[in-house]
């Protein structure tokens, strides 16, 4: 199933199509005026009939209830010949569309409607209408349809049908055989089936208002499909009550509200699945007491044609061609492709322009906070007209063709330190960094500083490799110039506050992370956030750490940089220069437990030598081997032992005597 967002294009097409078929405000106002006028006129006709029958004027009697659509009217209404008038069909359901505005009302009678009553109402209705409005209406009777037809004489042309019926007609059909019949029907009784259909339409209107009106997009989809039934003859048999049932079942069974495009697609999926075909579930009519198939009037060929057409429409929708189903022109994209020219002019005056797509085109509705931060940063930089070039790019623009050389590579594998150099006008500049790219960037910063160019935070945008990005908490850290060999340029505030701004990670002179190196010397240190200032795009954090009773502060654009700055300040104050020897922490060798305690202690003392404080990373002495396991080097199968490594011994590796312990015999099984 497509994602929710993928239906946005379908929603746009459906809503545009709906706006073209929805009646205009003038048409809706004309419908409301005509229906209200006829309803009020029929009420006056009812009053006139009661006066004629009783011979007295009864204007204070109960008015006709318009909103009640009940068929089981009580016997106390026996004084009125006309019990009430109700709206049915498109007027009651709100499904009117252009060029298809059939207006219908039901006039409920106390007794079974006759031709005589129809003529009486038809003759008196124009008189009552003239009392209510100056507009001219044509009133005709249609005995075959058991109705009165009313037409207006001005644009828009509207036709209103008033159908006469009575609850007694349905009650009589439900009586069982053998029950007494109250009286014989009059000879001029109107068509019984037409009256029954009017009662069914009344039930349909009540059901629709209760079940379908509250469903999101249901009424919109019904208007779209009614227009489809008018345009495509294949769909014409489905128009009316069956279409309303299918839409309500298709949309109402979803566990969430649907947009117009997705709701239309769901209805098409339901029809394309073959529910109309013979052998299918059929379409139950909920407004009938007995089980009734609402599709019983359709032929097998009609059902197959509608199913085939729905499958074709579903394929078109799946391939983004719903406009063909709606018979409309495709709409342009909601995000038009535009080309912008970003020109970069160098100092020599040569300019170059490149056509690129707008920055916002690739964003869409992505909720990634990093992308949102990048978008905000781009807007800020564009507004300030800042040239997006780091120090290396700027130096290459000023002095093209410079050759960078790798002087040395030191440090452990997990934290290497590269030293790069460049020769500018006979002067050699050197700088270090965790990668060649960062070292070159630091060299460029030094050269620009020597040449007098600004290299502040706002101008130098961070350019780091993917390995360095993984070490940062935020992808948008932007810090400016300083390298490990240029720590003297860092600024120190009151209370030993140090703010270091570098192109890459903050490192000590030995190429380590300041926080890690300080943790090796003093464990259990706690860093506290002192302050947080600046806007969302230019934050400044101040962190504080207490070491040996002294507090050191560091500042940076994020907490990690501020923490490293504080640690670097502590290292420079306490563990550099003459303070290094006094503050060096003695390391204690943990006493080994078990049988090997004495032997291990002796071995450690033997290899310690000239004041070596402790063992380096290396040898591990295990405890006594557990029963059932073979200790390395003692009775090991296949001749393996704890001999020296195949590639020789490391220079600083500590060798310990191998302790041999007796173990339980382990049986060896042979399967050959």
From Swiss-Prot:
Its main location: cytoplasm. GO terms for biological process: cell motility; mechanosensory behavior; spermatid development. It is found in: Cytoplasm. Residues 477-497 have a biased composition (Low complexity). CDD domains: DSRM_STRBP-like_rpt2, DSRM_STRBP_rpt1. The modification Asymmetric dimethylarginine is found at residues 612, 617. Residues 387-453, 510-576 form the DRBM domain. Pfam families: dsrm, DZF_C, DZF_N. One of its GO terms (cellular component) is manchette. The keyword DNA-binding applies. Keywords: Cytoplasm, Developmental protein, Differentiation, DNA-binding, Methylation, Repeat, RNA-binding, Spermatogenesis. Residues 357-371, 466-476 have a biased composition (Basic and acidic residues). InterPro entries: dsRBD_dom, DZF_dom, DZF_dom_C, DZF_dom_N, NT_sf, STRBP_DSRM_1. Involved in spermatogenesis and sperm function. Plays a role in regulation of cell growth. Binds to double-stranded DNA and RNA. Binds most efficiently to poly(I:C) RNA than to poly(dI:dC) DNA. Binds also to single-stranded poly(G) RNA. Binds non-specifically to the mRNA PRM1 3'-UTR and adenovirus VA RNA. Interacts with EIF2AK2. Associates with microtubules; it is unsure whether such interaction is direct or indirect. This is Spermatid perinuclear RNA-binding protein.
């Amino acid at each position: 199933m497509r994602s929710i967002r993928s239906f946005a294009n379908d929603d746009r097409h459906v809503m545009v199509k709906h706006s073209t078929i929805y009646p205009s405000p003038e048409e809706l106002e004309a419908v409301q005026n005509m229906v209200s006028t006829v309803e009020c006129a029929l009420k006056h006709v009812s009053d006139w009939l009661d006066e004629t029958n009783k011979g007295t004027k009864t204007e204070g009697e109960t008015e006709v209830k318009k909103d009640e659509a009940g068929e089981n009217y009580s016997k106390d209404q026996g004084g009125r010949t006309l019990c009430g008038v109700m709206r049915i069909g498109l007027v009651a359901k709100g499904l009117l569309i252009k060029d298809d505005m059939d207006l219908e009302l039901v006039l409920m009678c106390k007794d079974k409607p006759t031709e005589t009553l129809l003529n009486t109402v038809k003759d008196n209705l124009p008189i009552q209408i003239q009392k209510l409005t100056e507009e001219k209406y044509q009133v005709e009777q249609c005995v075959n349809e058991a109705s009165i037809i009313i037409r207006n004489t001005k644009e828009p042309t509207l036709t209103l049908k008033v159908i006469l019926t009575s609850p007694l007609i349905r009650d009589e059909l439900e009586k069982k055989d053998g029950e007494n019949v109250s009286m014989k029907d009059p000879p001029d009784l109107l068509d019984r089936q037409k009256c029954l259909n009017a009662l069914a339409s009344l039930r349909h209107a009540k059901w629709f208002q209760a079940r379908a009106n509250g469903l999101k997009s249901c009424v919109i989809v019904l208007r779209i499909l009614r227009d489809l039934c008018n345009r495509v003859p294949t769909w014409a048999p489905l128009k009316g009550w069956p279409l309303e049932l299918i839409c309500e079942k298709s949309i109402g069974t979803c566990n969430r509200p649907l947009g117009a495009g997705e709701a239309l697609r769901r209805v098409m999926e339901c029809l394309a699945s073959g529910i109309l075909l013979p052998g299918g579930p059929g379409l139950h009519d909920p407004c009938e007491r007995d089980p009734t198939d609402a599709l019983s009037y359709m032929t097998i060929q009609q059902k197959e044609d509608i199913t085939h057409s729905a499958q074709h429409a579903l394929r078109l929708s799946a391939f983004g061609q719903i406009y063909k189903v709606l018979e409309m022109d495709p709409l342009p994209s909601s995000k038009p492709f535009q080309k912008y020219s970003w020109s970069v002019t160098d100092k020599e005056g040569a300019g170059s322009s490149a056509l690129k797509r707008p920055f916002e085109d690739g964003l869409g509705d992505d909720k990634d906070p990093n992308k949102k931060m990048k978008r905000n940063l781009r807007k800020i930089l564009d507004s300030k007209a800042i040239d997006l070039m780091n120090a290396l790019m700027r130096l290459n623009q000023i002095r093209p063709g410079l050759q960078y050389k790798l002087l040395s590579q030191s440090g452990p594998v997990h934290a290497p330190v590269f030293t790069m150099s460049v020769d500018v006008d006979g002067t050699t500049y050197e700088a270090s960094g965790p990668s060649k790219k960062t070292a070159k960037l630091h060299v460029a910063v030094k050269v620009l500083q020597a040449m007098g160019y600004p290299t502040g935070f706002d101008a130098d945008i961070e350019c780091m490799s993917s390995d360095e990005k993984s070490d940062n908490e935020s992808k948008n850290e932007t810090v400016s110039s300083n390298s490990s060999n240029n720590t003297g340029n860092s600024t120190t505030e009151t209370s030993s506050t140090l703010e270091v701004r570098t192109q890459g990670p903050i490192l000590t002179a030995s190429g380590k992370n300041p926080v890690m190196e300080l943790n090796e010397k003093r464990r259990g240190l706690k860093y506290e956030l002192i302050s947080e200032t600046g806007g969302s795009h230019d934050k400044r954090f101040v962190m504080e750490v207490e070491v040996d009773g002294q507090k050191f502060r560091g500042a940076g654009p994020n907490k990690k940089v501020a923490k490293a700055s504080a640690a670097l300040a502590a290292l420079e104050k306490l563990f550099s220069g003459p303070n290094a020897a006094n503050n060096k922490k003695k390391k204690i060798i943990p006493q080994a437990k078990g049988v090997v305690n004495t032997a291990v202690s002796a071995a450690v003392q033997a290899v310690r030598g000239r004041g070596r404080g402790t063992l380096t990373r290396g040898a591990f002495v295990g405890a006594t081997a557990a029963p059932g396991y073979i200790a390395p080097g003692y009775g090991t199968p296949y001749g393996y032992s704890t001999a020296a490594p195949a590639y020789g011994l490391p220079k600083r590796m500590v060798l310990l005597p191998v302790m041999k312990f007796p173990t339980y015999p382990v049986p060896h099984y042979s399967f050959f």
